[in-house]
């Protein structure tokens, strides 16, 4: 049987962005899903230091504990916004229900927060009552980001957040992400096949190859002076494009 990911050991610090790159089938999405608790590993542990200082084993939590953690301290931005949004309710509701899940009930405050976040992610506030299905792909992705960040999580997982977007839309979204990550002091685990995205957003980089870590280090170091033959091939293929 094929092993999706093995012999991976890593740490992540508050405010740090860790990029995971590699070709399709290299194990990067498998690793992301295990780190975020969405996929159970056959061996090993994922430890998370919560806001109260307690060290939690993500995969030892029961479903209620895991959901509570996802509501309060963790976020997950999907490659396809439809996987992370409720497409049949308004943009304001998509943002507000995350707050309601944490106990917020005052409609005026929920509405004001939703409007503030739409503005922060550069969506016209007059579109607050539109459903995501009425938005462009880029706007849907920005709404998904707002929905995740409205609860001020400490750690956000991002799976190809700019994938499938036009170049101009991608550039605006990257600029937005860079500023939000910096301003909020987020820790981020970012999966991308685009080395330009990895260079712009991540501090450290992991190169995955056949389910294993081929190389890891500071992003500029790995991309400017790759040591592993696969890393060299990956970088050179981008330079030739």
Question: Which residues fall in each region the model found?
Answer:
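ABC ATPase NBD Q-loop/coupling interface
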Residues: 45-68, 222
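The feature captures the beta-strand-to-loop junction immediately N-terminal to the Walker
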Residues: 21-23
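ABC ATPase "signature
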Residues: 213-217
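A short, surface-exposed alpha-helical micro-motif characterized by mixed small hydrophobic
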Residues: 198-200
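Helix-to-loop junction immediately C-terminal to a conserved catalytic motif
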Residues: 36
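Conserved ABC ATPase "signature" region
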Residues: 109-126, 235
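Conserved ABC ATPase signature
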Residues: 131-135, 139
């Amino acid at each position: 049987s094929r092993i999706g990911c093995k012999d991976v050991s890593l740490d992540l610090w508050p405010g740090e962005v860790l990029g995971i790159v590699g070709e399709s089938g290299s194990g990067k999405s498998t690793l992301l899903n295990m780190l975020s608790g969405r996929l159970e590993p056959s061996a090993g542990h994922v430890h998370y230091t919560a806001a109260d200082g307690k060290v939690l084993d993500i995969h030892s939590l029961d479903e209620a504990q895991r959901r509570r953690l996802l509501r309060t301290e963790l976020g997950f931005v999907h490659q396809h916004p439809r996987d992370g949004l409720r497409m049949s309710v308004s943009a304001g509701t998509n943002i507000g229900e995350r707050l309601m899940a944490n106990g917020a009930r005052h409609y005026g405050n929920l509405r004001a927060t939703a409007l503030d976040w739409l503005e922060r992610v550069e969506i016209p506030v007059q579109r607050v009552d539109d459903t995501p299905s009425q938005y462009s792909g880029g706007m849907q992705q920005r709404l998904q980001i707002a929905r995740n960040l409205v609860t001020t999580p400490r750690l956000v997982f991002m799976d190809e957040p700019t994938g499938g977007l036009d170049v101009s839309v991608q550039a605006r979204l990257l600029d937005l992400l860079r500023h939000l990550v910096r301003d909020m002091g987020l820790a981020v685990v970012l999966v991308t096949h685009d080395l330009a995205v990895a260079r712009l957003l991540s501090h450290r980089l992991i190169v995955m190859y056949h389910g294993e870590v081929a190389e890891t280090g500071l992003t500029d170091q790995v991309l400017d002076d790759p040591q592993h033959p696969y890393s060299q091939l990956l970088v050179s293929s981008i330079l030739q494009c």
